[in-house]
Amino acid sequence: MTAPIAGPEIERLIHLLARLPGLGPRSARRAALHLIRKRTELLGPLAEALQQAYNHLIPCQICGNIDTRDPCTICADAKRDPTLLVVVETVADLWALERAAALPARYHVLGGTLSPLDGVGPKDLNLQSLTERVAQGEIREVILAVNATVDGQTTAHYITDSLAAFPVKITRLAHGVPVGGELDYLDEGTLAAALRSRTNF
């Protein structure tokens, strides 16, 4: 184990930064040094923003999104189509779809996927409230935007079965060739999904 090269406060900062996705020990040291160099214009405001977020973040009681208000900004947006509901696994997935800005829908965050091997069952996810939202009658289409993994497929089938009694259309995101992708570089599963999801041209 290497000896510390800075005081415990800086070492702790580096250690915590290294726990962020995409940052290893070296990147964390560089980030820490950058923050220290920009103490007034970056480190101080960042510390304040983190404290504010820590104090005010709450889950939306309607959709499960994370925000500083309840209902969240998306659920409170009257311009969104209340008949379209996009079901996602995580808040990160919700944010990714929002960046695409393709559909002014509302969302429902499950908080993960069903995974019998990991002991994650229906009661561990935000599934009951999904059924309750659909039962209110305003939603006309449920778009399943879950990952194309075994657990994602299991979750999608469970949701489809759970909502079978309601007059809603259930759709899935198309899977296949990414924009700008070359067929030669795609795996067989992706190509098969693309062929099955083909559309008129």
From Swiss-Prot:
Coiled coil: none annotated. It holds the Pfam family RecR_C. Keywords: DNA damage, DNA recombination, DNA repair, Metal-binding, Zinc, Zinc-finger. The keyword DNA damage applies. The keyword Ribosomal protein does not apply. InterPro entries: DNA_Rcmb_RecR, Rcmb_RecR, Rcmb_RecR_Znf, TOPRIM_dom, TOPRIM_RecR. This is Recombination protein RecR. It comes from Beijerinckia indica subsp. indica (strain ATCC 9039 / DSM 1715 / NCIMB 8712).
